Design a protein with these regions (language model features):
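Catalytic loop of short-chain dehydrogenase/reductase
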Residues: 2, 28-29, 34-75, 86-88
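Short-chain dehydrogenase/reductase
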Residues: 9, 13, 51-63, 108-113
Length: 165
């Protein structure tokens, strides 16, 4: 329905764009201008459009924002990159949505800390690193992390790959 489409685009697409625009004057004055967007790498697999069309389009528009702004802002010394979880993350969306698997899915997820640690690595890179799409896992491997078990909600449990990978 159009109401759902409008809502997810208002939050995801427009919200991300508006936040970036509002931050630009401050980022332009900074020697450490960085934008990190929670956006998936673009994988044009029809399975992501089946039943989640409005949400998927809104998330992919955020991915396009990363590509566009990284090109536009590179000469201003502002890096724009994206991060996306490699596995499901224990969030309220996963925990309380039975359609996503509820408690069983939580057990097969990682803690939110993995995304925070990966974001720290991405944001600490040279500002010439821009227009990149990282998974939390790939960013941490790049940072030298080898033990990912500490991020598991239930260590030893097989992990659920994220839905957009």
């Amino acid at each position: 329905p159009i109401k759902r489409f409008d809502l997810v685009h208002e939050v995801n697409s427009r919200g991300s764009f508006a936040l970036c625009q509002a931050a630009l004057p401050h980022l332009m004055k900074s020697d450490a201008g960085r934008i990190l967007v929670l956006a998936p790498p673009i994988a044009l697999d029809p399975k992501w459009l089946n039943g989640t069309l409005a949400y998927t389009i809104s998330k992919y528009s955020m991915s396009m924002l990363v590509l566009g702004l990284s090109g536009e802002l590179a000469m201003d010394g502002i890096a724009v990159n994206a991060i996306w979880p490699a596995t499901t993350i224990d969030t309220a969306a996963v925990r309380y949505n039975e359609a996503l698997g509820g408690e069983e899915m939580v057990r097969r997820s990682r803690k939110p800390r993995i995304v925070a640690d990966a974001a720290l690595h991405i944001l600490s890179q040279n500002k010439t690193v821009t227009g990149q799409f990282y998974t939390d896992e790939s960013a941490l491997m790049e940072a030298g992390v080898e033990d990912f078990e500490k991020y598991a909600v239930e260590p030893g449990m097989p992990l659920q790959q994220d839905f957009y990978l």
